[in-house]
């Protein structure tokens, strides 16, 4: 009987530890509200600290609220973050250099910094993309700063096109830590 109770206690403690380990860090979880639901993105300051800092700053300023997904390529990625909605705009902040010290492979749900095509890879600003599939060749070419941890099914429903005929928008973007404020 004691062994049975001990086994149950160990199992309960393990489940609690597992749940705590998998709970998102509110300070490093970005929430994007789309018309179909919420997308949660785990920010990766361990991989791209300057890009994560920029995304947090712009998010807290409300910069991303209402911006369109202006370039959405089926089977590849959905791009947003341009206030002009053309792919040529950005915030008033200086551009960022690429961060490749640690470069995880891009995969479905990876979030990376969009930039102008140039050999210096130093023109990332406010734009970003969320990968569908086929993004592996971007590894080491674009800065990965996040991973979708919930709601990828909503990203899958974003209108396709370059630009889409009726583009979807990010209704509201905030950090999970600020959700109840």
Question: Which stretches of residues belong to each language-model region?
Answer:
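Bacterial N-terminal signal peptides that target proteins for export
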Residues: 1-8
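Cyclophilin-like peptidyl-prolyl cis-trans isomerases
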Residues: 2, 14-181
């Amino acid at each position: 009987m004691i062994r049975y109770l001990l086994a149950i206690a160990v199992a309960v403690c393990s489940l609690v530890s597992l749940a705590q380990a998998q709970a998102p860090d509110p300070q490093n979880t970005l929430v994007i509200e789309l018309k179909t639901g919420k997308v949660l993105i785990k920010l990766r300051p361990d991989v791209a600290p300057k890009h994560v800092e920029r995304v947090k700053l712009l998010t807290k300023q409300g910069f991303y609220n209402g911006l369109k997904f202006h370039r959405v390529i089926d089977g590849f990625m959905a791009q947003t973050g341009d206030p002009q909605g053309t792919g040529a705009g950005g915030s008033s902040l200086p551009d960022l250099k690429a961060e490749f010290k640690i470069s995880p492979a891009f995969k479905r749900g990876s979030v990376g910094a969009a930039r102008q095509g140039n050999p210096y890879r130093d023109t990332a600003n406010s734009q970003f993309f969320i990968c569908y599939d086929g993004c592996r060749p971007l590894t080491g070419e674009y800065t990965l700063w996040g991973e979708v941890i919930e709601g990828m099914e909503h990203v899958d429903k974003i209108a396709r096109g370059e630009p889409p005929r009726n583009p979807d928008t990010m209704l509201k973007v905030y950090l999970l830590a600020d959700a109840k404020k």
